[in-house]
Amino acid sequence: MNYEFDLHTHTIASGHAYSTIKEMANSAKEKGLKLLGITEHAPTMPGTCHEFYFSNLKIVPRVINGQKMLLGTELNILDRDGHVDLSESIIRDMDVCIASIHPPCFQQDRSKEEVTRAYLNACENPYITIIGHPDDGRFPVDYE
């Protein structure tokens, strides 16, 4: 299979990855990716970036060593209403916003109904472009 892009990646800034943005760009270029998205975890995830990090993304080049880049975040869906952990004033300037449910950040009932409601409500946010790993078995989803 030939992949042309990867939009769900993390650097050392997220606290659990090992490469810098520049190293990720170089690796993506070596692999022949046409587009690389860097989407660090938003602040509710323990050990990750402060909101100032995301405000500063606007100064990072969108082409690094010839590799086209999108810079954004992996937001944490916090509740059944689909609220996320960065403000609209920050996420509206990002190239890509993934919204995901993670165990340390979603402290709501994890029933299929509540998780599905959380994802559907998050989809109403005009700045969210991708739903991250909805197949996580810890958070059952009604696909019907």
What are the roles of these predicted feature ranges?
Residues 2, 42, 47-144:
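Extended substrate/RNA-proximal surfaces in nucleic-acid metabolism proteins
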Residues 34-35, 39, 129:
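Short acidic/polar active-site loop segments enriched in Thr and Asp
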Residues 22-36, 56-60:
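Alpha-helical scaffold segments that flank or form the walls of functional sites
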Residues 7, 39, 132:
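Single, functionally critical "micro-switch" positions that shape active/binding sites
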Residues 16-20, 112:
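Glycine-rich anion/phosphate-binding loops
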